[in-house]
């Protein structure tokens, strides 16, 4: 193969890669299809109060009524290894991009729609200062139910122990099986002590929220 042919081959290959990536990004989720694919999900997220045990004991997150774009981004991060968690990586790697889009669409509309007041419960001053320090409301919204971007998560009413382990995971960079490598959140979480992260998690978890853990049966 001569130089011209090699360059042409490389160019065409790059076009195919870009096209495939664009198609994956542009997938439309089908909630009805997602309902048929959620058997693995309900084994943990369909049991109210279900607890994970790695890297410590905590309740698995509520995902019903969560933003579809956030669920999609989270699953892709587990699949790529950006988020390090053995169980979730195994689950995510078994899913195609279409599966991820469908499941995300399903859980966004799953559960009962709840109307939450725009104004949040005023935090204690020490917590307010911590939230201001990180600019948390700037991305996650003033009431922590209406993020500025749909790829950001709703936080209000999420399990406190999950929020705490999630925040800690952004500080954990040296562990091969635990941690999250998101540059923005890692930078935000780094300046806080663990005690301060706990205060933030406890406050956010105490807020009225739209997120739900809805009991689901594997038997349909």
Per-segment meaning from a language model:
Residues 39-42, 102, 118-119, 168, ...:
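Intrinsic, low-complexity N-terminal interaction/targeting segments
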Residues 1-10:
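Bacterial N-terminal signal peptides that target proteins for export
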Residues 9-19:
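Bacterial N-terminal signal peptides
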Residues 48-54, 81-84, 109-125, 137, ...:
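Inter-heme linker and motif-flanking segments adjacent to c-type heme-binding CXXCH motifs
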Residues 31, 35, 48-78, 89-94, ...:
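Gly/Gly-Pro-rich "capping" loops immediately C-terminal to redox-active cysteine motifs
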Residues 26-51, 119-144, 159, 216-220:
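Sequence/structural segment immediately N-terminal to covalent heme-attachment motifs in c-type
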């Amino acid at each position: 193969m001569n130089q011209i042919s090699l360059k042409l081959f490389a160019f065409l290959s790059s076009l195919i890669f870009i096209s495939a990536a664009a198609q994956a990004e542009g997938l439309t989720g089908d909630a009805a299809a997602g309902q048929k694919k959620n058997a693995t999900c309900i084994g943990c997220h369909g049991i109210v109060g279900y607890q994970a045990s790695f890297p410590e004991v905590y309740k698995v997150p509520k995902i019903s009524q969560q933003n579809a774009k956030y669920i999609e981004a989270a699953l892709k991060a587990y699949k790529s290894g950006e988020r390090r968690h053995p169980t979730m990586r195994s689950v995510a790697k078994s899913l195609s991009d279409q599966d991820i889009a469908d499941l995300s669409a399903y859980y966004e509309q799953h559960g009962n729609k709840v109307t939450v007041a725009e104004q949040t419960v005023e935090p204690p001053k020490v917590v307010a200062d911590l939230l201001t320090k990180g600019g948390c409301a700037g991305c996650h919204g003033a009431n922590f139910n209406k993020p500025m971007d749909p790829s950001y998560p709703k936080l209000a009413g999420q399990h406190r122990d999950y929020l705490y382990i999630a925040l800690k995971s952004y500080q954990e960079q040296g562990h091969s099986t635990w941690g999250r490598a998101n540059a923005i959140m890692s930078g935000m979480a780094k300046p806080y002590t663990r005690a301060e992260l706990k205060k933030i998690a406890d406050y956010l978890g105490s807020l009225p929220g739209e997120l739900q853990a809805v009991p689901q049966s594997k038997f349909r």
